[in-house]
């Protein structure tokens, strides 16, 4: 599970939400440590089919999997997404909310304290010296789990 998904699970739990974290089958063990109430393999259609009505879905990835989740959102439920309203949401009784990053120093400070206290973590994929930035950029472009850190 990537950094955005980890943060979404963490923040949702802080607000008292019943959290179902959607990950690839290969990531289920790792996701269990995040404290979600349920882990759902998004690459397993039978697991998706087992879903009941959902009050809301937060799509932090933007892949085609959202199409299979939309039918499970209850009438007048919420779809929060990073990529705008998907076509599959047209004609459905749900509210689509576009998620945009907003700088907020107080929230970032709170997360920083939680990281320092060991209550929240983001995996580090690899550290590079600043002088080796030419190697970091292609790795970042490929995507993957964990953050790439540049150090002086």
Predicted regions and their residues:
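Terminal helix/beta-alpha structural elements that buttress the NAD(P)+-binding lobe
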Residues: 1-152
